[in-house]
Amino acid sequence: EHLNVALQCGGSDAWSGITSNPSLGYAADLIVKNGGTAILAETPEIYGAEHMLTRRAITPEVGKKLIDRIHWWEDYTARNKASLNNNPSPGNKAGGLTTILEKSLGAAAKGGTTPLNDVLLYAQQSNKKGFLFMDSPGYDPTSVTGQVASGCNIVTFTTGRGSCFGCNPSPSIKIASNTEMYNKMVEDMDVNAGKVISDNKSIEDVLSLIHI
């Protein structure tokens, strides 16, 4: 009940939505079902997959809060002569992601399957437990900062392309989506979810390696 876990990703690839993100989502479900809290963030990176979260909203009002934040980001990017469809990044594309929809479906998988209990503004704290969403940019250092400010005491971070990101205020658990990248960055990674592909392991097998 004292765990408040940030669900985060950076440098995603085509394997992220198949291995590391569903594994983290499974872990998030167990945390929530045992009285803890798990907070997903990065609003622009669920664009196109927001229905997967709103249909889990505990009330229509909670679902509307998420849609309102999506609309804010649509307006913000339009005012700056850009579009949320400009995502994914060149690195994501090099890793096999071709559209924001593919990226968003994978990103949403980190949130597991439990009800969405609240939608928070950036760095906003809440007295609610369970699965929450926090509005933030799609830039992991900024997003994680907001999650920690909102009360997260552990950061879980999935990556497919590789990332040296760490968070000094909170312990960080790094989860690789593929074995090749894990082996190249083994000193920066904690869990190899790529074993789902390379070693024919199950999501449950990977979960046993995520010690939270």
Spans of features found by a protein language model:
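A hydrophobic, small-residue-rich beta->alpha segment in the mid-to-C-terminal subdomain
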Residues: P171-I173, N178-S208
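Short, conserved phosphate-binding/catalytic loop or strand-edge motifs used
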Residues: H2-N4
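Conserved small/polar residues in nucleotide/adenosyl-binding loops
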Residues: I210-I212
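Glycine-rich anion/phosphate-binding loop at the beta-strand->alpha-helix junction
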Residues: Q8-S170, K174
